[in-house]
C-alpha cells in the first residue's frame, strides 16, 4: 500500500509539474521528442493488441501504474499477469481524435479519445474513453509511467 501511495504521489507530481510549465517550456510542435512519443504510442497500441509481453515490459516503467475505467489501480506486474492469463485482451483500439502530445524536457503527457473493444481484468469493455498517458524519458528511452481511462457518456 505504501508503494502504491508513493507511486500515485509521483504520478500526480509529474502531471502537476507538466501542467504547471509555461508554454515556452514546451518544445516546438513536431519536435524530435514529440515524434518519439508518437512512435511509442503506436508501439504501445500494437503491443497491447498483440499481447506482446516482452514489448510491454520494456514500454512500462518498473513503477508503472494503470487506472482503468472502473477506477481500479493496477501495477505493472498485475497488468502483465492479466495480459498473460487472457483476462485483459483488446480486439480493437481506434483513435477518435488526434492525439495531443505535450513534451516537457524529459516527460510528456498525451491525451486522446479512443474507442476500445475487448476486456480488462476479465470484464467486458466497449465504448469511447478519454485516455491520458504520462511518459518519462530515461536511460531506457521513453517509458510509460502511468495511464488512465475514463469512460465517456454516450451522446
Model-derived regions: residue spans:
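Positively charged n-region of N-terminal signal peptides that target proteins for export
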Residues: 1-4
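Bacterial N-terminal signal peptides
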Residues: 7-18
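Short, low-complexity N-terminal intrinsically disordered segments enriched in polar/charged residues
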Residues: 19-62, 143, 155
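Hydrophobic pocket/interface hotspot
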Residues: 44, 56, 64, 79, ...
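A short gly/proline-enriched turn/hairpin at secondary-structure junctions
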Residues: 48, 63-74, 85-89
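A mature extracytoplasmic/lumenal domain signature
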Residues: 60, 70, 105, 114-116, ...
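Surface-exposed, charged secondary-structure patches
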Residues: 82-125
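Short beta-strand edge/turn micro-motifs at domain boundaries
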Residues: 128-153
